[in-house]
Amino acid sequence: GIEKIISRSMFDQMLKHRNNPACPAKGFYTYDAFLAAAKSFPSFGTTGSTDVRKRELAAFLGQTSHETTGGWPSAPDGPYAWGYCFLKERNPSSNYCAPSPRYPCAPGKSYYGRGPLQLSWNYNYGPCGEALRVNLLGNPDLVATDRVLSFKTALWFWMTPQAPKPSCHDVLTGRWQPSAADTAAGRLPGYGVLTNLLNGGLECGKGPNPQVADRLGFFRRYCGLLGVGTGNNLDCYNQRPFG
């Protein structure tokens, strides 16, 4: 299991300031909840060589730390020690409700970002809830109140391919082979493609930007703590977003 790679003390070192009094999520993201959620996704962090497993865990925690960061450039212990500080999206610009016959929004509910990967939009809450057997369309706040479920939503997004896109898990474990179109678009296996999968439309193919650099900073720190190389193709500065 993943606890062989990430012990409780390692989790606490990686997410060093998550329980800081200044963090709105203090007390929410626990090691036990992380392990409990991972049991529902048994291939997460357990596929391939030890290095591949370490890299997947560093990548998951790196991307989720960026999504929930409370860091700033001169923060104590550096900006990359402040992952998992936030639970809900700050100042959501809308209720993230798109017209959808299959995943209609519930009256009065808002599908702004919640949890480690900041699950957003009714068309993500819907299928995620179906997969986890919870009515997340009707109860989106469960992602911000149920610790284990919150981690499960992040792991669901990480592990589940959304065709024609691969899953983050398949990219990291080598199951994804880029097509000719992927290669032409600069999408090669590595951490950069994960950023493309998670937020490519806003962050990729635009040259260097602070969001991608922040995602990378967390990943580098966590790879260092786990004693594993980062691999290649780390950013998506020159990748076209997935369609």
Curated annotation (Swiss-Prot):
EC no. given is: 3.2.1.14
What the protein does?
A: Defense against chitin-containing fungal pathogens. Shows activity on chitin, tetra-N-acetylglucosamine and chitosan.
Instruction: Give disulfide pairs as residue numbers.
Output: C23-C85, C97-C105, C223-C236
Q: Where in the cell is it found?
A: Vacuole
Q: Which Pfam families does this entry report, sorted A to Z? A: Glyco_hydro_19 (PF00182)
Major location (coarse): other
InterPro entries the UniProt entry points to: Glyco_hydro_19, Glyco_hydro_19_cat, Lysozyme-like_dom_sf
Give the GO terms filed under biological process for this record.
cell wall macromolecule catabolic process; chitin catabolic process; defense response to fungus; polysaccharide catabolic process
What is the similarity comment for this entry? Belongs to the glycosyl hydrolase 19 family. Chitinase class I subfamily.
This protein's name:
Endochitinase
